[in-house]
Amino acid sequence: MKPNNRTCDVITNKDESLPALLLPALNSYTCDDSLLKGQISSNGRYQPFGFSDCSLLPKRLNIQAGQGSMPVSSIQCADHSYSNWQKESEKTKLPKLGCPTEYTEYYKTVSSGETTDSAVVSSIATNRLKRKRQRDGPSCDSCRIKKIKCNATIIIFLQDRNLISSISSNLHYTLSQDDINQFRMKFFRKLPDVMGTYEVIKHLDKIVLFKACTSCSRRNQKNGKCLFSRGFTKSDMNVFPKINSKLKDKSIFEMTVDDYVAAGFQTL
């Protein structure tokens, strides 16, 4: 391209923080010769559009056509590159939530009873996460039907393959105090006195301390049963359905060790 009386029109931006826009004349260049862009920009003086050229501009640009021009050297362009932004962000240190920081105004000693701003935000975020997060294991039958959160307590006190064929022939069996005393030396030597708070249940190869969920306890104080017909844990859900597929019309509470072996599982 070859410059031919190159002129430009200065379009002022409404936002004064932004640089002005320079538009070249429509008939400023011809394609007779090839010229590097760097050579084109070497001419620093520009003249405004002539009246005939202004007629070719859009209506909004015609407003600025009569204004004087300005040299390119007077225009300052801000550096908005990513590398420059990254360098500036690295210089700024922000305190982490719930952690000590160099900014003393953001941090106080939690152990003294005072609460930090960052600790409060962290606590709120943690509580929201807990409310939204689903239960780790299966829910009881009632809560699963109602599609509500089940808060039943399931504590695995002991897991031993010998338990499958011990204590009772049933795979799911609620122990009495006499059963605990009978097998205390073998399985319950370290079991604390929890009979008033938890049910002690033999469940497949586990001894489980179980407490019914709030929903089932309120629904029926007399016969409130919090039932887990698919098992207490996710691993149980792989065992009982397989037994049930071969033994129809038999619930988890009626299955025996013989049913367990008939389904292809081994006791030891």
From Swiss-Prot:
Main subcellular location: nucleus
Phenotype of null mutants: Leads to increased expression of NCE102 and PRR2, when SUT1 is also deleted.
GO terms assigned for molecular function: DNA-binding transcription factor activity, RNA polymerase II-specific; sequence-specific DNA binding; zinc ion binding
Alphabetical UniProt keywords: Nucleus, Transcription, Transcription regulation
Localization, UniProt: Nucleus
GO cellular component: nucleus
GO process annotations (BP): cellular response to starvation; negative regulation of filamentous growth of a population of unicellular organisms; negative regulation of transcription by RNA polymerase II; positive regulation of induction of conjugation with cellular fusion; positive regulation of sterol import; positive regulation of transcription by RNA polymerase II
Transmembrane portions of the chain: none
Similarity field: Belongs to the SUT1 family.
Functional description taken from the UniProt entry: Putative transcription factor involved in the regulation of the activity of the cAMP/protein kinase A pathway. Involved in sterol uptake. With SUT1, positively regulates mating by repressing the expression of the mating inhibitors NCE102, PRR2 and RHO5 in response to pheromone.
Official protein name in the record: Sterol uptake protein 2
Organism: Saccharomyces cerevisiae (strain ATCC 204508 / S288c)
Source species taxonomy: Eukaryota, Fungi, Dikarya, Ascomycota, Saccharomycotina
Gene name of the record: SUT2
